[in-house]
A protein has these predicted regions:
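Glycine-rich phosphate/diphosphate-binding loop of Rossmann-like nucleotide-binding domains
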Residues: 5-28, 136-208
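Buried hydrophobic positions in well-ordered alpha/beta secondary-structure cores of metabolic enzymes
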Residues: 10-13, 63, 120, 158, ...
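Buried hydrophobic packing segments
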Residues: 20, 24, 190, 281-289, ...
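N-terminal beta-loop-helix "entrance" segment that forms/cooperates
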Residues: 30-53, 212-214
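Glycine-rich phosphate/nucleotide-binding loop
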Residues: 44, 95, 102-103, 216-300, ...
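N-terminal glycine-rich phosphate/adenylate-binding segment common to multiple enzyme folds
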Residues: 44-141, 229, 233
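Glycine-rich phosphate/pyrophosphate-binding loop and the adjoining helix
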Residues: 54, 130-133, 139-172, 176-179, ...
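C-terminal non-catalytic interaction/assembly regions of soluble proteins
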Residues: 340, 344-484
Length: 484
């Protein structure tokens, strides 16, 4: 019998988890549970990552975590335990399925527009690294990482999801029209992997256009894959299409460890009242059962849930307000009483169990994700980010004194817009510039020469940050300033 780790969570977490586990027990789900300590009270005990060492060890030995909603203390400088868990165990893909649930009234259900949409979100990278700095008292910087290996992991998973779902179309949402290198890399890898799945129609859409289309015709989409921040926003938008986060399951998938959770809040205002809606956590649990190959029990529970919703049974947060609502325990018991019944709409077909054995890799060190470079990297200059409240021409005049016969000053930009050698007097400035130096003869240079340049520039300016201007062969690996 497979053993999994269970973290009940904060607020309403324990009561909805108990309700879901009671349904599992009634369905004779062949799982054993080891409860681990994670969440708000663990932070309060002084564990800055929101979990005890024993919890981490247990999860890393079992490979599956089933968790309720958790709270991160506000204003204490600690990271979200939810994000920490996903990143620590490299659960690189977040899968969220959104379907019309009969008995949950929405604008689209009333218009008879069916929704069967899957969002796959990259789960590790992007701005969610949380690498932020104040460069001056007025300027904050957040670094955004999009990597080729990380993109390939989540994109390949998304194509496999589409294949297993029987989808005909997979769409990449992006902002590559603006973020040409980061989102451009993600989009490039999307189409590279698409070549391996000729049976799927692969297309892309700019994310703002995607959002507009999703709230007007969500039935036109099947599987959508996005980078982390955009995927976070779009997946919550899609939850609103089917009734809210209370009906939105979530799975965080990694090569070794996977996490199944409800992504709604802890609802402390109703905690302990036994009135919370356990549907999202139950749907996440059903996804976990499928992941573990427990298909028979997953089908039994899902059909019973769908039948219960169709029958009009509801907790206080949804459903027909003219009929009495039930509490959390009563809702779970109603589902149990409906085992063996089929919903009128979209019943799930009976399946036979195909149990999956979770085998944890024995690692000698952290896996290094790296692809083969097309050519050797070379350095041809640097962007220096300097603090100054002087006018661009004054900054340029000072910088010109530090070229050392090797570099030329190419451009100065402010908030990404060029202000020297050309620009507009109507461009507002802040007290930090990006100044770009390139080798005078377009030849390669060394890191030591860049360090020497920085030493000279530091005589007049505080250097807040820097980036090398790399080439791969004849291809520049950096963007131009707006207006350059």
């Amino acid at each position: 019998m497979t053993k999994i780790a269970v973290a009940k969570g904060d607020g309403i977490g324990p009561e909805i988890m108990d309700a879901v586990l009671s349904i599992f027990d009634a369905a004779q789900v062949p799982l054993q549970y080891e409860v681990v300590e994670m969440g708000r009270w663990v932070f309060d005990k002084g564990f800055s990552n929101g979990m005890t060492p024993e919890a981490q060890q247990t999860i890393e030995s079992l490979g599956i975590l089933f968790k309720g909603p958790m709270e991160t203390p506000k204003g204490k400088g600690v990271k979200s335990v939810n994000v920490t868990a996903r990143k620590t165990w490299n659960t690189y893909a977040n899968k969220r399925s959104f379907q019309t649930l009969h008995g949950v009234n929405t604008v689209f259900s009333q218009a008879n527009i069916p929704i069967d949409l899957t969002i796959v979100r990259e789960n590790i990278e992007d701005t969610y690294g949380g690498i932020e700095h104040m460069l001056t008292h007025d300027v904050a910087l957040c670094r955004r990482f999009i990597t080729r290996p990380g993109s390939r992991q989540v994109l390949r998973y998304a194509f496999e999801v589409a294949k297993q779902k029987g989808a005909k179309r997979i769409t990449c949402g992006h902002k590559a029209n603006i973020m040409k290198i980061t989102d451009g890399l993600f989009l490039e890898e999307f189409y590279n992997i698409a070549k391996e799945y000729p049976e799927l129609k692969a297309d892309d859409v700019i994310v703002d256009d995607l959002c507009m289309k999703l709230v007007t015709r969500p039935d036109l989409f099947d599987v959508v894959v996005l980078t982390n921040l955009q995927g976070d926003i779009v997946s919550d938008l899609c939850a609103g299409l089917v009734g809210g986060l209370g009906f939105a399951p979530s799975a965080n998938i990694g090569d070794d460890i996977s996490i199944f959770e409800a992504v709604h809040g802890t609802a402390p205002d109703i905690a302990g009242k036994n009135i919370a809606n356990p549907t999202a956590l139950l749907l996440s649990g059903i996804g976990m059962l499928r992941h573990l190959g427990l298909l028979e029990q997953a089908v039994t529970i899902e059909n019973a849930l769908l039948y219960t919703l169709e029958s009009g049974v509801h907790t206080g947060d949804f459903g027909d307000k003219s009929t009495p609502s039930v509490n959390t325990t009563e809702f779970a018991n109603a589902i149990i009483s409906n085992f063996g019944k089929l919903p009128a709409n979209n019943p799930r077909a009976t399946q036979t169990n195909e149990p999956v054995t979770i085998t944890m890799r024995q690692l000698a060190g952290n896996p290094m994700l790296e692809t083969a470079a097309e050519a050797a990297l070379s350095i041809r200059g640097a962007d220096l980010f300097i603090a100054s409240n002087e006018q661009p021409q004054v900054v340029a005049d000072k910088l010109q004194q530090h070229l050392g016969g090797i570099f030329k000053l190419v451009t100065i930009s402010n908030r990404g817009t060029q202000v020297w050698p050309k620009g507009s007097i109507y461009t507002n400035l802040i007290n930090q510039y990006r100044v770009r130096f390139e080798t005078a003869d377009a030849s390669n240079t060394s890191q030591q020469e860049i360090i020497n340049l920085m030493q000279r520039v530091s005589a007049d300016f505080i250097i807040c940050s820097s980036e090398l201007l790399n080439y791969m062969g004849d291809k520049a690996l950096y963007s131009l300033a707006q207006g350059q």
